[in-house]
Amino acid sequence: MFEAKLANAGLLKKIVESIKDLVTDAPFDCSETAMSLQAMDSSHVALVSLKLEVGLFDTYRCDRTINLGLSLANMSKALKCANNDDTCMLKYEENEGDSIIFTFADPKRDKTQDVTVKMMDIDSEHLGIPDQDYAVVCEMPAGEFQKTCKDLSTFSDSLNITATKAGIVFTGKGDIGSSVVTYSPSSNTDDETEAVTLEVKDPVNVNFSIKYMNQFTKATALSDRVRLSLCNDVPVVVEYPIEENGYLRFYLAPKIDDDENMD
């Protein structure tokens, strides 16, 4: 049996809305310690990695490790039935068929609503993500990163990122013109959520598809902060922490010689 209860359905809504345009079918792995997901996008260019630890849930029970295959479009439809501040219970019993039950409860109205969603058989390939020692780790306000990607996509299909100890520079350059956004590390800020921090072992200069970066920034709703882990010639990691008990990470391979084909 698997049963997990979130205090706010809104959190699960935000997670699903962040990834449903990248990943169609989601193989959720549920264990005693966490509910997690790892999946490539349909073009096999980007990898999505989600982890929701037990501490994120009000109650959590998983008798044995199981895989729950769900269409994210169908999951989104189910979650649209919930108010953001409803509680959300996910329940699956192996002897009761191939469906998962979402129960939304509104304590203010003494109301509950059950939505049953059919599960799917999904071939989930666990991709080994090698441990990487990154040359640059940058943490910044998630809203700033989202705006930067959106602004630069007006000028270019590619996002160039360069970073040194002096700062991190985002550049979009195209036929109609260009835009450059520079962030220096914040030396003193009263609000930690607004700080830009940089750890630089070696300088980096890398190019990525800005279309994918704009997709990733849909996760801005989940977190005030975003972490970019960068190294020349290896995939970038764009990470959004989920409260203090989980994360949503996106991995994207760099573009080679500004070529659109990133496979």
UniProtKB/Swiss-Prot annotation:
The record's listing under InterPro entries reads: DNA_clamp_sf, Pr_cel_nuc_antig, Pr_cel_nuc_antig_C, Pr_cel_nuc_antig_CS, Pr_cel_nuc_antig_N
Q: Which residue pairs form cystines in this protein?
A: none
Pfam families cross-referenced by the UniProt entry = PCNA_C, PCNA_N
Subcellular localization is given as: Nucleus
Q: Which UniProt keywords apply?
A: DNA replication, DNA-binding, Nucleus
Function of this protein? This protein is an auxiliary protein of DNA polymerase delta and is involved in the control of eukaryotic DNA replication by increasing the polymerase's processibility during elongation of the leading strand.
User: What is the designated name of this protein?
Assistant: Proliferating cell nuclear antigen
